[in-house]
C-alpha cells in the first residue's frame, strides 16, 4: 500500500467520502489503480506511461460516444501537469463489480452464462468496428504490426535471454508469420479476466463493464479471444467460439499464435517503459 501512503493527501482530495486507509490498490502493467467507492485514481508506473495518460483519457471519451452495450470508465479529471508538484494521474468513474472468482466456472450454468455474455461483448465490438465514426476515433493496427513486434523482441529482448529462451521465442515469433492483416473489429487489446467486471444477479454473474482500454484499436478479434482463453482455459473459449460462430480452424490458429506472444508482449512493453518488475516477470520463462 506504499502508493496510498505516498499520495495520502492527494487521494483524500480526489476521493472525497472514502477513508484513505481502507482503499484497495490494483497493480496493473502500466498503472497503480487506487479504487474508491465511486471513483478510481490511476497513477502511472513509469514516465512513459505518464506521457500516455492524456491519450488514454481521449480514448475513453471516444468510447463513451459509442454504444458498445456495456459500461466503460468515464474520465473525470487529470492532474500532474508539468510545473506542478503533483504526480501524473487520471481520475475515472468506477464500474461496479469485480473479476470472476477462480472457481465460479465449475458450475455448467454459470459457465454457459459467462460464455454467452463474452460472445455478446465480442459481437458488439465487431459491430462497432463497422461504424465509420468508430474507425475514425480509434487507431488501426498497422499492416506490419507483428513483423515490427518480432524485430523489437529480437533486438531488445534476445540479449536478456538464455539460449533456450531465444529458441523458445523464435518458435513463438515464427508462428506470427502466417497471421493475416485483419482490421474487422474494435479490439480491447488486454481482455484478460482482471479487466472484465461482473456482478451477481440471482446467483449468476452479469457483466457490468470492461476497464483498462489502453491498447484499444481496430484489429483482429483473435487478440481478445486469445486473452479469454489465457484467463479461463480452453473449455470456456470453446463455448465462446461456438456461440459467436468463430469455431473455424483459421480463427483457432490465429488465437494460438497470438496467445503464444503474451509474455513477450509484456516484456517488450516493460523494457521500453523501463519497468524492471514487469520485465522480469515477462521474461521469467526465457532466462
From Swiss-Prot:
Please list the residues that make up the active site.
Answer: 190 (proton acceptor)
Signal as a keyword of this entry, yes or no, is no
Assigned keywords, A-Z:
Antibiotic resistance, ATP-binding, Kinase, Nucleotide-binding, Transferase
What GO MF terms are annotated? ATP binding; viomycin kinase activity
Q: What class of enzyme is it?
A: transferase
Asked if the record carries the keyword Transferase, the reply is yes
Signal peptide range: none
Q: What is its EC number?
A: 2.7.1.103
Biological process (GO) annotations held by this record are:
response to antibiotic
Disulfide bonds listed in the record: none
Q: Which reaction does it catalyse?
A: viomycin + ATP = O-phosphoviomycin + ADP + H(+)
Which family would the database say this protein is a member of?
Answer: Belongs to the aminoglycoside phosphotransferase family.
**NCBIfam families xrefs:** viomycin_Vph
> According to its UniProt entry, what is the function of this protein?
The aminoglycoside phosphotransferases achieve inactivation of their antibiotic substrates by phosphorylation.
Name this polypeptide is given: Viomycin phosphotransferase
- Annotated organism of origin: Streptomyces vinaceus
Encoding gene (name): vph
